[in-house]
């Protein structure tokens, strides 16, 4: 972490920020891939875990909790099942990280020039984070959709390769098929990244002096706290996004064969509440927090360290 808890907008050149963001996305995705697959499987599961009668006539596995789901995937699909969808996911995380941090830096720098009408620092961070998150999500959304569809595949493969999936969606669903659930994704990520960066920037100065933390840095701890608070608030929209991403001609071919037909964000939320109750909107929240906390910690720690290394490299080359 930069000395004194320096603001992210004041760190590095644009090129350094893009490279550090891409590296952070790459490392973060690899570390949390298994939890991401588990989260997606749980989010797509529609039957009640507390009502055994709802399991009747279910085609596909019945997952109960994070560890049992991991064991079930490994038993039925092998250890590689925990990394399904990793290629489009890695591409997405690299591009997302690069775009997000570059957009955040650019937006915060622009907002800082608004004197005498400048926003308070937390509001600046919220607006910049929301803008960066929305832009990065919209730009990389087709990869996000492909990641979800591959992770939702069971032992019977819906798509044989990344190329085959792109070709199939283009032929059978058209260009709009790559953006199913995009409105829910943007609606979720805008407040999420706004809250995340506002919380993170506020905690960085406080945690910069905590030298007893792992790796001697407070970046990871600040990322964990910010992520947990933000993720809990917007989780229902994340679940809706996943349900919408697997709509279309292949809806009944994924590991959960009984995924209902959903149309639109509002109608999807209403249908989930009507058939599964309010708890249905938070299915997979626990594993989502288990994933989001370390993912954010790894992302921010790797970003800060990569940026620090790139800055030192530039100084050494001068």
From Swiss-Prot:
The keyword Repeat applies. It is a multi-pass membrane protein. Solcar repeats lie at residues 12-110, 120-206, 214-309. Keywords: Membrane, Mitochondrion, Mitochondrion inner membrane, Repeat, Transmembrane, Transmembrane helix, Transport. Coiled coil: none annotated. It comes from the Eukaryota. GO terms for cellular component: mitochondrial inner membrane. Pfam families: Mito_carr (PF00153). Signal peptide: none annotated. SUPFAM superfamilies: Mitochondrial carrier. The keyword Aminoacyl-tRNA synthetase does not apply. InterPro entries: Mit_carrier, Mitochondrial_sb/sol_carrier, Mt_carrier_dom_sf. This is Mitochondrial thiamine pyrophosphate carrier 1. The lineage of its organism: Eukaryota, Fungi, Dikarya, Ascomycota, Pezizomycotina.
